[in-house]
Every structure is written in C-alpha cells, then in structure tokens.
Amino acid sequence: ALDNETNEIVGESIVMTSHDDELGVAAGVIECFQNCLSENGIAPEDVVFIAHSTTQATNALIEGDVAKVGILAMGGGGISGMLAKSQSKVGDILLDSGRYIHTTHTYLKSKQVNEETVREHVQKLVDDGATVIAASEAFGVDSIEHEMLVKAEADRRGLMASVASDISKLYGLTRRTRTAAINGSILPKMMNTANCTESAVRSAGVDVPLMIMRGDGGVMDINEMKKRPVLTMLSGPAASVMGALMYLRASNGIYFEVGGTTTNIGVIKNGRPGVEYASVGGHDTYVNSLDVKVQGVAGGSMVRAGNKQILDVGPRSAHIAGLGYAVYTPPEEIEEPELEFFSPK
C-alpha cells in the first residue's frame, strides 16, 4: 500500500500462490488484500485506487493452460477471398514452453454473413472442439458489425468470444487474427480470476474502481480486462518496472523480476522502459507491452530428468506438483536430502 500523496510505502503483505484453492490464484489475491488492510490499520474507506497486476495471462501461455479456439474468419470472394482465408488460418500457435494453442478455422464470405450462416459456422467450430470463438474479418477495423454478430451468436450459446477488431484497430489480418486467438485462449482462466478478485475487493468494503495493470505499463478497468485479457501479458513485470520508476526513481538499469514460474528481464534507459509489440512463440501480435524478456525458469522451477540426466528446468513450478518452494523451507528440514521424483498435476 502506498500513500497517494508521498508515494511512501505504508503497508505490505505477502502470501503464497493459492493454486489449489477452489478460487484459484484469486484466493491469494483476496487474502493478501485483506491482510494488507488489517495488518496495517488501513480502513477500506481510505483506499482511493487499486491497481492489480497479474501474471495469470503470462503463466497460462508459458504453461499451456489455454482453451481451444475456433476462428470464424470473414472476407471477400475470389482471389482476395483465397488470400483472406489463408491469412486468417493461423493454425496451432506454438508457445515458448513447446506447448500449443490449438485452433480450428472456418471461412465465411462477408456478403453471406447473416444470423443463419454465422450460426452454422459457429456450430462447425464447436463440433471441432472449440470452447472459445474468435471473430476476425478482413478490413474488419473499418466496420466491426460482422465480428460483433459472431460474438452475439457465441453469447447466445454461452461461449466466450474474442473480437479481433475490438482488440486492435491496426490492419494486418494474420497478426490481428493471431492476437484474437491468443486472447480467446486465455479468456476462461482470466474471467474466473477477474470475477473472484472483483468480488473479494467489494466484499472488503472497498468501492473504488479495480484497475488492472496492462503489459504496456498503463491500466484498464476490470470490465475491459474481461474482454481483452491478452493486454495483461507481462502485467507483472510492467508493474515492477513502474514501481522502479516511481519508488526507486531508477533512470538507467537492468531489471530482473524472479517469480515462482518465470523470470522477467528488462531495461530502463533514460528513465523510460522500452515498449514493443509482444511476441508469443516467435509470432508477433498487436499487443503493446514493455520490452521484457520472459524465461520459464524461476524460484519454483522443477528440474526435469530422464535417461539418467537432467533434461531441462521449468517451466512447471513446484506448486503444480503439490510441493512447497525450498526458499520457504527451514534449513534443518532439508539437511541430508534424498532424491525423489514428482510429476506436475
């Protein structure tokens, strides 16, 4: 907790990540927030602003905890239609961990778009195993009407939907479609976290807006995050960089943030962090983020072994296997350790 006028730290609280709780990591956020108020004598009515940074989007992509996305692409006919169909068929998207965001694809000519044809194509995607729908139309940034019609059909079915031209207003069908697919893949996990966190803040008696840190260092409200969670990629390191700029007043430096699942590395030069489009699995997106490199190895990383040798380290953390982190273990409990093998859940 910071004093809004002096930027002085007036309270803090640290809790373990609550992956096994029925509320997921949101339970830890709830506990940390409530502890920070009670342990530091802060009254709910004294809170004027809440900025929540989350590594949920980053961790979901690092660990492959993503949903299968059905892409309903739209565009012209003839040669231009062939090009649009090819550009919007992004295939399975490789993640840095070696896992994939699996996608399925169907194409509908823009002149044929209506409620009936959209319903048929969404059904085809569902039959192919999609649990989230991504709508993307060639030149959709000029008119979002058709993409919103797809979203309306997804809403009618109780499916989550990602609208490409609602995420980015930049041209480039392939990159815009890929961004929408990535956004859709993390929607289920992020929606649950957002709802639980918002409920917890309200139950604590705090009525001020709950703002979520974006990956570019800005903030957005909770409702925007529910539509565009992909913008929170690198939210955690963005918050740390902003903290370094504001509290430490660092003007030049190399920044490391070591968490449980990932380590983030960034540079502050002349008082400014670098900003660029985020890349997922080597593929560019239309998501502005701080120029931070994310490595899937950190304080809780598990060592992977096989064939009598160490194969790799990470990206899965010890908590995924139901284990604690060694850093929190009393030294006397790990004297003369014996080697044991565990598997992530």
Where does each model-flagged region fall?
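N-terminally biased helix-coil "hinge/interface" segments that flank
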Residues: 1-345
